[in-house]
Amino acid sequence: MATFKDACYHYKKLNKLNGLVLKLGANDAWRPAPVAKYKGWCLDCCQHTDLTYCRGCALFHVCQWCSRYNRCFLDEEPHLLRMRTFRNEINKEDVEGLINMYNIIFPINERVVDKFINNVKQRKCRNELLIEWYNHLLLPITLQALSIELEGDVYYIFGYYDCMGKENQTPFHFVNMINRYDRLLLDDKNFDRMMHLPVALQQEYALRYFSKSRFISQIKREMNRHDFSDNLMEERDNPMSFMQVTRNCVSAHMNDNDWNERCKLIGDARNYMELMKSAYTEHYSISNRCKLFTIYKLNIISKLVKPNYIFSNHGLCALDVNNCKWCKIDNHYEIWNDFRLRKIYNNMMNFIRALVKSNTNVGHCSSHELVYKCISSVFIVWKIEKWNDSVRTLFEYLEPVEINHVEYVLLDHELSWEMSGVIMQIMNGKVPRILSFDDVKKIMGAIIYDWFDVRYMRETPVIVSTTNELRKLNKDNNLMDGYDYELSDIE
């Protein structure tokens, strides 16, 4: 069993404060829980196991047992997980507060050791000092933490995580924060704790301490779309659905500027217990709009695109063609439920086809052309250099004419009404008959930016904001967007 989990189970019986702070779902009776998908460490009980999604941030960081308490490291309520979570710059005083908290709730002294030994020896055949029976006394104080970066803020969730070499399918990575403190002083504090243990347990304590205090920090892990669960969506079939978030709060709202001070609250047991009595939950409906999700969707489109359409004579939009084996696209993917992506695909293909028909002689969708290679890349607008190269390749294929050192192409083929509206919006209310390279690039960019302006999007969804930030955004009515009314970013 996990050392931290065992320590919480046994130490919660010491006093009333510990009974409140160290209550873990992993040590309670199992209740029905969401299906676990990913391997990693539960931030609540620190054991390596199958993880399920958190209802506070949609990340996979909680085990099936601990999920019953719905605790998130971004909560406002100062439960144990939140008090172990630090943010951004950590100074020596912050670390001192964490160490003091550990000493308060996980003390190792002669009285505590004798109490646990007497409890164990009451059981049959437990007179030996086996590690399995005294695992809870072998919890060293280390500065081992799991770290994650969210929108420029770096979070460190301290704890004692066993089996660091096991599989990790989460965006968290291990860091050693011992450099933020005095290494020799931390050694001394742990040796003081170790001296109260029986000799048979001291070696194991020392091994655990040094293995978790002398390791090399891991490389930061990149986040991807699959790090976030879809289970918080109000309607999973609706790509514009809001995410339902639950956060644990207290009546005395706390300032994020004092984020690293939470662990010091436990120093005043009376006030801490009064504060925890005021705990309640807040619920928010939050838009899932962000660069991470948008890039994932546009990447899928770039792989599904049927470039043959740009040479076709079909009278239908690109997504509506059904009877042509070269142009028919598989529109059964869930991604096409999003009207924004349908508009982007149809408009982009309509515009490119108009350019091709206006400037070349090729007129059938069964043709095999070199320009096909660059069509999929025109949807990956966030890769600026690659996108510019693709637009340039397409433009050069149209055999532009140079006038006064500026190259132009024609645009005299029929456009859809919607695409004409996009061009008029960009070109001062007109649909010009000739376009320069900059004009073509501006129009193709606008087709995507009108709905997904990735240049100004936040990297991750708003759901990973702190509780105070969610509260402020909700007050200003900025947690939702206007896409349900088919309003674009520009509108």
Swiss-Prot record:
Its main location: host cell. It holds the Pfam family Rota_NS53. Residues 82-176 are annotated as: Important for cytoskeleton localization. Residues 42-79 are annotated as: Zinc-binding domain. Keywords: Host cytoplasm, Host cytoskeleton, Host-virus interaction, Inhibition of host innate immune response by virus, Inhibition of host IRF3 by virus, Inhibition of host IRF7 by virus, Inhibition of host RLR pathway by virus, Interferon antiviral system evasion, Metal-binding, RNA-binding, Viral immunoevasion. A motif (pLxIS motif) lies at residues 485-488. Residues 320-491 are annotated as: Interaction with host IRF3. The keyword Nuclease does not apply. GO terms for biological process: symbiont-mediated suppression of host cytoplasmic pattern recognition receptor signaling pathway via inhibition of IRF3 activity; symbiont-mediated suppression of host cytoplasmic pattern recognition receptor signaling pathway via inhibition of IRF7 activity. Residues 1-81 are annotated as: RNA-binding. GO terms for molecular function: metal ion binding; RNA binding. GO terms for cellular component: host cell cytoplasm; host cytoskeleton. It is found in: Host cytoplasm, Host cytoskeleton. Belongs to the rotavirus NSP1 family. The integrity of the zinc-binding domain in NSP1 is important for degradation of host IRF3. Interacts (via C-terminus) with host IRF3; this interaction leads to IRF3 degradation. Interacts with host IRF7; this interaction leads to IRF7 degradation. Interacts with host CUL1 and CUL3. Plays a role in the inhibition of host innate immunity by inducing the degradation of key host factors required to activate interferon production such as IRF3, IRF5 or IRF7. Associates with components of cullin RING ligases (CRLs) including CUL1 or CUL3, which are essential multisubunit ubiquitination complexes, to modulate their activities. This is Non-structural protein 1. It comes from Rotavirus A (isolate RVA/Cow/United States/B223/1983/G10P8[11]). The lineage of its organism: Viruses, Riboviria, Orthornavirae, Duplornaviricota, Resentoviricetes.
